[in-house]
């Protein structure tokens, strides 16, 4: 049975994600920007939280962990490589490790770039991937700690997941990301359509997260740095893919 997903808006533009196994009644949350909205969502559904999964150490993803742990008794799991700067962990995770939510099994994917210890969680039976600030709707996270080469390889790992995978990223950044993408390829029909769809969703107050991986592969410039058309668009026809990615990231940082 696929996991039930609840997207919980937090802070000004963050998301936390509740995942619930109806068969066993077990519930986990991915990232805790703040505890209040998550506790409210749990109470509204009568769910009990047993596990907190963390993608990376930034405060807007972990600030509510201690309050939520105290209120629910949930255990906390995060990257072993970042254990020294995450809230105290009950379970330290690395590439290929498995986490469970009820009967569902998720695999840990190390995705350095935004931070050096960033991880993602892929639940194949539910077609869900929780990517934090690595792969995002129409974008990717800034390179605060890692290199462009590291982030490019991380994005390649995520883009190799099944195309039907829903990408649950940590922020509502799609509108700005889409406007930036349109500056690179203003005449792309697929991009024009997606920019319009995102704008319409935001106008109606609907989240753009999660997004389909297939849509990201088709329109997200940070996944397309190896494509000839995008290399031509940025004037880097003969450059290595990671170099093109780095240039796109540099332009986005200044956008």
UniProtKB/Swiss-Prot annotation:
Catalytic activity of the protein: an S-(2-hydroxyacyl)glutathione + H2O = a 2-hydroxy carboxylate + glutathione + H(+)
Residues annotated as binding Zn(2+) 1: 56, 58, 114, 133
Domain of life: Bacteria
EC number: 3.1.2.6
Cofactors (names): Zn(2+)
Subunit organization: Monomer.
Membership in a protein family: Belongs to the metallo-beta-lactamase superfamily. Glyoxalase II family.
UniProt function note: Thiolesterase that catalyzes the hydrolysis of S-D-lactoyl-glutathione to form glutathione and D-lactic acid.
Name of the protein in question: Hydroxyacylglutathione hydrolase
Organism: Cereibacter sphaeroides (strain ATCC 17023 / DSM 158 / JCM 6121 / CCUG 31486 / LMG 2827 / NBRC 12203 / NCIMB 8253 / ATH 2.4.1.) (Rhodobacter sphaeroides)
